[in-house]
Amino acid sequence: MKIKLSAALLFAFLLLTGCRVEMATEQVHPIPKPTGIKVDIAGTVMLQEKELIVEGQTNLPKDAIMYAGIKEYGDHESYARVINAKAEEFEEYIAEGTGKVNDEGQFQIRIDRINPKKRYKLEVLFNPAIQKSKIQEIYGMTGENIRTNIGYTEFKHNGNFVNGMIKVAPIVNIDDYSGNGFKWNLTDVFQGKSRPLQ
């Protein structure tokens, strides 16, 4: 027994001496500052019987185009899964709308609520590929000048990859709690959950 224990300790000692860390020779590299232009988007969506009204605030320049679309969840997806961002939505937008940023950085987008008895995922996007040339000069045609931060996403537009910014919100069934006459906050895809505000 003592021989086995001694052999195990010797083996562990030899193994650990070969795994030492040499910290004195490591060089510390400074963390580079983020490059690019930071895009901030915040807002809400008002759920009405026949229409969804997105109201937002951004640091984008005047006349930047904001896009919004809804994707349907399957009938099997529950209220809890939808509001907790666990549900799987279909890939295609079934209703879309756009709005322009004004002088104060505000925008509004109206989308038809196709079927109030269904649940949807709302996506609000800044897509550089659909902007006028004066906006594309700032952010790049494919968003190459946008700084990576919360809400930054890559998606396909007309077969090309584009970098942009996204916010989301659940659109619950009109008969669900807070499904009609309530505002929901727009949130980041991976950072928290949208909740009703009123």
PLM segments and residue spans:
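C-terminal motif of bacterial Sec signal peptides marking the signal peptidase cleavage site
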Residues: L15-G18
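Positively charged n-region of N-terminal signal peptides that target proteins for export
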Residues: M1-L5
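Ser/Thr-rich low-complexity repeats and stalk/linker segments
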Residues: H29, K33-L47, L60-N180, V189-Q198
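Bacterial signal peptide processing site
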Residues: R20-E22
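Structural beta-strand segments of beta-rich domains
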Residues: K50-V54
